A protein has these predicted regions:
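Short Gly/aromatic-enriched secondary-structure transition segments
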Residues: 48-60
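N-terminal post-signal-peptidase region of extra-cytosolic proteins
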Residues: 19-30, 37, 57-82, 100-105, ...
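N-terminal signal peptide c-region/cleavage motif recognized by signal peptidases
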Residues: 13-16
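Exported/periplasmic cell-wall-interacting domains
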Residues: 21, 82-167
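Well-ordered beta-strand positions in beta-sheet-rich domains
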Residues: 31, 52-54, 77, 116, ...
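Positively charged n-region of N-terminal signal peptides that target proteins for export
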Residues: 1-4
């Protein structure tokens, strides 16, 4: 009888850890496409946008990220490799920047490419309410979104999803 109870508990624990990623219209998100010039993040399936969100970029938005501290958002192909909750930015999903070519370029130039590029929500304090951030580029190179949009993307995108960031 104890082994049956243990089996039931183990089954419950396994199922509770299963992915809870949602789908849009019966289609999973295959890729995140960021269009920097349009300030858009699109969730893509079969090459077509399923949903589009407005985003904010680094304070120096033109051009690809070159060195640590340049406040630019990178351009290229990356992956969502981990995620976390944050007191400062609510939900955050890490982008695998720098990729191999970013690292090689930085090594050739003798500089640090930077790191910790995230897709994240916005701070929401009395001093700086969330709507203050939505219309300007305010990050240090990350991709900022309204918290309600970030919660939705968090639930729709699984770790390992490709991220393409275009100029």
């Amino acid at each position: 009888m104890r082994w049956l109870l243990a089996l039931i508990c183990l089954s419950f624990a396994t199922l509770s850890c299963a992915s809870t990623v949602e789908i849009i219209g019966g289609k999973p998100v295959e890729k995140i496409l960021v269009l920097k010039s349009a300030r858009q993040l699109q969730l893509i399936n079969d090459g077509k946008p399923l949903k589009t969100y407005r985003i904010s970029l680094g304070k120096n938005p033109k051009g690809a990220k070159l060195i640590e501290g340049d406040r630019r958002t990178p351009e290229g192909f990356y992956w969502i490799d981990w995620r976390k909750t944050s007191d400062r930015f609510n939900l955050s999903m890490h982008i695998s920047y720098p990729n191999i070519s970013d690292s090689a370029r930085a090594r050739r130039e003798g500089v640090s490419p930077g790191s910790m590029i995230m897709i994240h929500g916005t701070p929401d304090t009395e001093e700086y309410p969330e709507q203050w951030f939505h219309t300007l580029d305010w990050t240090d190179g990350c991709i900022g979104m309204r918290n309600v949009d970030m919660r939705e993307v968090w639930n729709l995108v699984k770790d390992g999803t490709m991220v393409e960031i275009r100029p």
